[in-house]
């Protein structure tokens, strides 16, 4: 059972999850996850969100420990995804006089998740920009639709200057594991929120008018120092800007010939002093990391075989992950391989036809089964283009 003080009257009552192996059924989380929840102690007591269903007992214990015999007045629900909302019914059963605070869309979702739960008059529907006074703390609710669900709202406490940011500024990893914020926050953002850059930009614009000294997300650490760094990262990610100079090479290979081409290219790039080269075998490496790095760096090389007159399934999945997250403002090079009718480059290029501001390398490497002298020259030309 872990609780900690965040502000003068704000307490963390969340939990760490080291049981989960795949977050949302797809993201590898070797360091677990945190599901964050907070209590604001005032004349009126507010609890901010709940946690995953597997941790009901631990979370309710954390809340009770902070309440120390007091009764909560409000449960504020910012986001209805089950890792944050699964214990709403358990909470209202434990505290039958509590009022649930949410917006209209949230209450609609709540009815669908908790069929048969009747809140009666214990509902407070709030509008965008509306405030709730707890005593000395005043909470203002700011709607953030599609960051990353339609009902999402964030909450600003003007007294302690705290932004309860829902899934915004979250990251993979439990709080009892120390690790770099940028990497796992980027992988979390690109994977889960990446499609909704314009909506995040709108939220950042709204947040820029607030005096924020602490950010309390629903995943990951509470942010109290150098907030400009985190906000700058979110601005870069949500505007699809290049974060760092470098080249990502993502490939799929069956008999090793396409892999050999990738190894040759990577070596040439390093010899030419390319600032950063990362290589991903899409069949074996973490797909989410390969997607993350494609958004981090400015240049991408895709290498695959022709397969059933199409492209290899892992490459198709990878490109789908990129395009559905609005991949743009990047340079792409193509390497294709085939034994009789290679057309992978054509197929891959067509997959990006709706992507904005894509620059294609002049050089495309066309391999017929294995590397030829001409292919080696093409790889050298491709390396020259990538290192410009």
What residue ranges belong to the model's regions?
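Metal-dependent phosphodiesterase/nuclease catalytic metal-binding core
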Residues: 39, 154-216, 221-251
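FMN-binding flavodoxin-like domain, especially the glycine-rich phosphate-binding loop
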Residues: 175-215, 219-222, 264-280, 290-388
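Active-site neighborhood of phospho(di)ester-bond hydrolases with catalytic His/Asp-centered motifs
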Residues: 48-50, 72-80, 100-103, 163-167, ...
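Conserved beta-strand hairpin/beta-sheet module of binuclear metal-dependent hydrolase folds
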Residues: 3-63, 154-157, 161-165, 258
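Short, charged N-terminal beta->alpha structural module
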Residues: 250-271
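Metallo-beta-lactamase
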Residues: 4-8, 102-152, 196-202
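Active-site metal-binding motif and surrounding structural segment of the metallo-beta-lactamase
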Residues: 43, 54-101
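Short acidic active-site motifs
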Residues: 87, 286-290
């Amino acid at each position: 059972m872990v609780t900690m003080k965040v502000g003068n009257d704000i307490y963390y009552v969340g939990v760490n999850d080291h049981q989960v192996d795949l977050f949302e059924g797809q993201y590898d989380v070797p360091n677990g996850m945190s599901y964050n929840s907070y209590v604001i102690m005032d004349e009126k007591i507010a609890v901010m969100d709940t946690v995953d269903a597997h941790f009901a007992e631990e979370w309710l214990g954390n809340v009770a420990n902070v309440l120390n015999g007091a009764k909560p007045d409000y449960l504020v629900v910012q986001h209805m995804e089950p890792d944050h909302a699964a214990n709403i019914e358990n909470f209202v059963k434990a505290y039958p006089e509590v009022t649930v605070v949410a917006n209209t869309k949230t209450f609609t979702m709540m009815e669908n998740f908790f069929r048969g739960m009747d809140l009666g008059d214990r509902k407070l529907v709030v509008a965008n920009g509306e405030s709730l006074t707890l005593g000395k703390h005043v909470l203002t609710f700011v709607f953030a639709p599609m960051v990353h669900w339609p009902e999402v709202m964030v909450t600003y406490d003007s007294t302690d200057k705290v932004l309860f940011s829902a899934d915004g500024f979250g990251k993979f990893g439990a709080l009892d594991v120390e690790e770099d914020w940028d990497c796992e926050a980027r992988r979390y953002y690109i994977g889960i929120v990446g499609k909704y850059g314009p909506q995040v930009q709108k939220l950042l614009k709204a947040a820029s008018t607030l005096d924020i000294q602490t950010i309390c997300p629903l995943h990951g650490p509470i942010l109290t120092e150098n907030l400009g760094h985190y906000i700058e990262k979110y601005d870069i990610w949500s505007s699809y800007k290049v974060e760092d100079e470098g080249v990502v090479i993502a490939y799929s290979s069956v008999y090793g010939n396409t892999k050999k081409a990738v190894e040759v290219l990577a070596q040439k790039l390093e010899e030419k002093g390319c600032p950063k080269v990362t290589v991903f075998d899409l069949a074996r490496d973490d797909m989410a990391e390969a997607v993350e790095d494609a958004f981090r760096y400015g240049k991408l090389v895709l290498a695959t075989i022709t397969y059933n007159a199409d492209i290899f399934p892992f490459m198709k999945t990878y490109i789908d992950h990129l395009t559905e997250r609005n991949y743009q403002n990047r340079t792409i090079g193509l390497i294709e391989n085939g034994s009789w009718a290679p057309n992978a480059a054509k197929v891959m290029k067509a997959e990006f036809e709706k992507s904005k501001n894509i620059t294609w390398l002049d050089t495309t490497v066309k391999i017929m089964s294995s590397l030829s002298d001409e292919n080696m020259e093409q790889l050298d030309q491709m390396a020259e283009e990538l290192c410009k």
